[in-house]
Amino acid sequence: MAFKLASSPHLKVQLQTQSVMRRVILCALPGIAAQCYFFGFGVLIQVMLAIVVALTAEAAVLALRKRAVLSTISDNSALLTAILIGVAIPPIAPWWLVVIGTLFAIVLVKQLYGGLGQNIFNPAMAAYVMLLISFPVQMTSWSIPTAIAQNPMDIGLTLQAIFGSMSAEQLSLYKLGFDGVAMATPLDTVKTDLSLGLTTSESLTKAIFSDGYGVGWFWVNMAYLAGGLIMLKLKVIRWHISFAILGSLFVCSSFGYLLSPDTHVGPLLQLFSGATMIAAFFIATDPVTAATSVKGRLLFGTLIGVMVYVIRTYGGYPDAFAFAVLLANLCAPFIDYYVKPRTYGHRTGN
């Protein structure tokens, strides 16, 4: 058998930043589509608004810094940040919320540190935490899934809700489910019920849990999981961080559930509710703000998974990925310093 031998250098071509970002965005599309299907047109409107603000803000800052505008914007990093912010914002949140968050992410968290590759925090998660602390009411008013909403919103009503032409009384009616209760996320519902003295099993009897995991949230997480697996197949990301997050979260939640099933959420609900899959595959794997070595990435992911469980279970926020990712970003330089790969040719001393 004849083998064709190419001339040197025998180097593997590395993906350019633009190509990597494009592939990540394409792999996120199934999850975005699932969110739009279950939570309405507001998801798409928030994403589009975030994209416009992100690209405009990045172009303005680059022009002020006298940097190349078109070549920098075309790397798609601002586009990806905008998409992550858009899907993290409640679908019918007021328009100014996503504008403030996107400006904060692009101008302060990314460009103020020098641009792509220089920021120490994940811009989308930093913006999310800033908004959550500054505007807790707006950031925790998540839409009822259209399948159990008393009054599902069409695109016209969604635009009215986002851009402020709908009264507060009208808006409250569109946030009610079939049981007459306005809810946030499944995890938030359980956390609120536990604080009222109900057990986990009693909380799971509500309409939002009619499919066992939280209507819509299971399929949204499955869609992001599918996109994440495609990224692994395309070698856009490595498996260490994602699997460390999911594995540590599963182990911690299983242990807590076995000890006290009445006051703890089961592992499957932890994995397929909230932002678990999008955070594990699309957010925590950001190569700029994560650890770099194999052991470092495993430790980085495990740290996020454990912190998510602790904050979800004992903290004041039901979905803790943004806080966990930012805290892990702080620890990434420390992890890289102390967890270094063995140098090629290294020999242990006798």
Curated annotation (Swiss-Prot):
InterPro entries, A to Z: NqrB/RnfD, RnfD_bac
Transmembrane stretches, start-end: 37-57, 68-88, 89-109, 120-140, 212-232, 239-259, 265-285, 291-311, 315-335
Pfam families: NQR2_RnfD_RnfE
GO biological process: electron transport chain; transmembrane transport
EC number: 7.-.-.-
Modification type FMN phosphoryl threonine: residues: 185
EC class: translocase
Cellular component annotations (GO), alphabetically ordered: plasma membrane
Entry keyword Cell membrane: yes
Membrane topology: Multi-pass membrane protein
Cofactor(s), names only, from the UniProt record: FMN
Family matches, as PANTHER family: ELECTRON TRANSPORT COMPLEX PROTEIN RNFD, ION-TRANSLOCATING OXIDOREDUCTASE COMPLEX SUBUNIT D
Homology family: Belongs to the NqrB/RnfD family.
NCBIfam families, sorted: PRK00816.1, rnfD
Known partners and oligomeric status: The complex is composed of six subunits: RnfA, RnfB, RnfC, RnfD, RnfE and RnfG.
Protein name: Ion-translocating oxidoreductase complex subunit D
Organism from which the protein derives: Shewanella pealeana (strain ATCC 700345 / ANG-SQ1)
